[in-house]
């Protein structure tokens, strides 16, 4: 394990290395699950705070791994540690694969040299000892520097005991004066200053992943990560002796009797088995809600205190969790780090990618106990179950009206707040269940900051807003270099993608590809229920609702629900009386465009619907259907 004290130049910005702790693979597998959870919380929160404080910190690989649920250890070659050949390994370290050069140490952590890997590594106590070393070299001035907030200390006291509480001073030195920075270790008497070249690791751009797997095309930032990944294809063990899953010789292999999944730690197996048993031993003292994991309880308790320590530096919005802040900031940056390996679609949230991947597999693990209908998403099942229970958990705090689905409530709130449905600071939304609040927390944070002055429409992302403006203006927002990038459209008003069959032109390549399927007949999107195929993904989504019964679009006036947004728009015109489609010949207006087309045939005399029995022609399909009943009755 390699904690790093601050070593930056006097006026240099803080780097994430200054507040990070690294593990090798061997060290990580000796950290018990509770301490792993603490480590994840601390690392993610420290990174989030550096970003929120305005530091230009590129995202390290360890943060990518933690966000995606991967194990965060890195190879020994990537950990910057001085080497001491005269250091002697403790005799208690019995595992043969550990009898090698483990004499690397980072910045005076002499006490860490004697920590046996046969014992469980205690993250918080190791960090406390590291802090004592730092304070010995840095002096009292270091303790006055600005702090990076760690998880709730009271909760950590209850979880690990007061003496093992993570010391927040560990990561406080953001701008330490040069005169109190250590350059020589008093314990070992060796110069431990970093080589300047080693500090350039952050020059690797977070989004660039140059190392790709030849078999599955998955990309990685570091070659060591690719090497580790390739072993999963070869079936090799993760360790030199060929052992799998980090199981050392002599360690007991804990296997779940329900699903066969294996674990290194008995505590890991115990936590996993709660999925099968439904046990939730950690209960909130305030509301009584129970959780499977103590970390989930700690996050939940923040909701009662109302504390929101994580603030966005761009819009000022505050959050109770660092992960919520990180997700919120992607609204401003447009970042979508979670990419589907099958279709290339990207998402802002890992959960969204997980839900999307189910559409490729066709798996529907969520089944209704009432009618047996199955769904690919838990949220779809929850919405469906309300058709049986009649539950309407989303209540308007202004007029008291309740809705079965959150989108219906958001649309309703526009009546009260004139098109600002997401500004939760201007009004409150009451939820009858705390689970509903949790599910919609990320949705409520979606502020539509970009306003179109021409038509009044609001947008959450600047890319959507820029695309929309092309409708109103021919002004060129791109310079010539940007215009020919893969993702940018050439110039506003231009339609560079032209169909060579019918000549129709499009602004976007995706629209052109979808249109071209009309000519080729290609229908790549197939329904898993009935086998019907579609040329567009959106058409398949709408079709699948005929099987699930899902109707997410609800009329705020009468409560009637629809499976398609276009059907809701047409229905709402029955309340407003709006008839936007007007005949140029006689001035008659209609609510539906199809009704206008049918009407215009009166003027043109066109009769495109022909009876196959007698050859009679009709201007409307409904008239043909009615006529065909005559032939059907005659045959009977």
Swiss-Prot record:
Molecular function per GO: DNA-binding transcription factor activity, RNA polymerase II-specific; DNA-binding transcription repressor activity, RNA polymerase II-specific; RNA polymerase II transcription regulatory region sequence-specific DNA binding; zinc ion binding
Renumbered zinc finger spans (C2H2-type): 211-233, 254-276, 282-304, 310-332, 338-360, 366-388, 394-416, 450-472, 497-519, 525-547, 553-575, 581-603, 609-631
Keyword entries, A-Z: DNA-binding, Isopeptide bond, Metal-binding, Nucleus, Repeat, Repressor, Transcription, Transcription regulation, Ubl conjugation, Zinc, Zinc-finger
KRAB domain: residues covered: 14-85
Compartments, as annotated in UniProt: Nucleus
InterPro entries assigned: KRAB, KRAB_dom_sf, Znf_C2H2_sf, Znf_C2H2_type
Pfam families reported in the protein's UniProt record: KRAB, zf-C2H2
Protein name per its UniProtKB record: Zinc finger protein 90 homolog
Organism in which the protein naturally occurs: Homo sapiens (Human)
């Amino acid at each position: 394990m390699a904690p790093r004290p601050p070593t930056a130049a006097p006026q240099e910005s803080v780097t994430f290395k200054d507040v990070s702790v690294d593990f090798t693979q061997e060290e990580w597998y000796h950290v018990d699950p509770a301490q792993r959870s603490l480590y994840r919380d601390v690392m993610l929160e420290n990174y989030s705070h550096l970003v929120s404080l305005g530091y230009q910190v590129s995202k390290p690989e360890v943060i990518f791994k933690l966000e995606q649920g991967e194990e965060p250890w890195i190879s020994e070659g990537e950990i910057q540690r001085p080497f001491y050949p005269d250091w002697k390994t403790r005799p208690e370290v019995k595992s043969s694969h550990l009898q090698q050069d483990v004499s690397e140490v980072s910045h005076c952590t002499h006490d860490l040299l004697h920590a046996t890997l046969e014992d469980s590594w205690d993250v918080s106590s190791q960090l406390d000892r590291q802090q004592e070393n730092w304070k010995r070299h840095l002096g009292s001035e270091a303790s006055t520097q600005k702090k990076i907030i760690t998880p709730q200390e009271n909760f950590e006291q209850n979880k690990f005991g007061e003496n093992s509480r993570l010391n927040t001073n560990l990561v406080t030195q953001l701008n330490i004066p040069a005169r109190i920075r250590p350059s020589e270790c008093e314990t070992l008497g060796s110069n431990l200053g970093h080589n300047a070249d080693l500090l350039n690791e952050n020059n690797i751009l977070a989004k660039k992943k140059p190392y790709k797997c030849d078999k599955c095309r998955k990309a990685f930032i570091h070659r060591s990560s690719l090497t580790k990944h390739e072993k999963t294809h070869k079936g090799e063990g993760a360790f030199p002796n060929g052992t799998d899953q980090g199981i050392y010789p002599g360690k007991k292999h804990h296997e779940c009797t329900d699903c066969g999944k294996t674990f290194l730690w008995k505590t890991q197996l115990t936590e996993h088995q709660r999925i099968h048993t439904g046990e939730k031993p950690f209960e909130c003292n305030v509301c009584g809600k129970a959780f499977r994991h103590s970390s989930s309880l700690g996050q939940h308790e923040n909701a009662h205190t109302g504390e929101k320590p994580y603030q966005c530096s761009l819009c000022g919005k505050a959050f109770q969790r660092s992960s919520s802040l990180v997700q919120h900031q992607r609204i401003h940056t447009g970042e979508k780090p979670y990419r589907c390996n099958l279709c290339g679609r990207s998402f802002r949230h890992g959960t969204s990618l997980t839900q999307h991947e189910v559409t490729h597999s066709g798996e529907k693990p969520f089944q209704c106990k009432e009618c047996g209908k199955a769904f690919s998403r838990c949220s779809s099942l929850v919405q469906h179950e309300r058709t049986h229970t009649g539950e309407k958990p989303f209540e308007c705090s202004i007029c008291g009206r309740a809705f079965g689905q959150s989108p219906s409530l958001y649309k309703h709130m526009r009546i009260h707040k004139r098109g600002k449905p997401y500004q939760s600071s201007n009004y409150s939304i009451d939820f009858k269940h705390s689970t509903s609040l949790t599910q919609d927390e990320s949705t409520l944070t979606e502020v539509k900051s970009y306003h179109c002055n021409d038509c009044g429409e609001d947008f959450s992302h600047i890319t959507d807003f820029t695309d929309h403006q092309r409708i109103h203006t021919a002004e060129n927002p791109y310079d010539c270099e940007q215009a020919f990038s893969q993702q940018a459209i050439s110039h506003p008003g231009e339609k560079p993608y032209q169909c060579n069959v019918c000549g129709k032109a499009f602004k976007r390549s995706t629209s052109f590809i979808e249109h071209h399927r009309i000519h080729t007949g290609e229908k790549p999107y197939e329904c898993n229920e009935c086998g019907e195929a579609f040329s567009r993904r959106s058409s398949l989504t709408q079709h699948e609702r005929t099987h699930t019964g899902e109707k997410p679009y609800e009329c705020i006036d009468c409560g009637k629900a629809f499976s398609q947004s276009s059907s809701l728009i047409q229905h709402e015109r029955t309340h407003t009386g709006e008839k936007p489609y007007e005949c140029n010949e006689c001035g008659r207006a209609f609510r539906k465009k199809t009704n206008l087309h049918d009407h215009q045939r009166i003027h043109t005399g066109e009769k495109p619907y022909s009876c196959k029995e007698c050859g009679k022609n009709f201007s409307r399909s409904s008239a043909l259907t009615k006529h065909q009943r005559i032939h059907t009755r005659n045959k009977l």
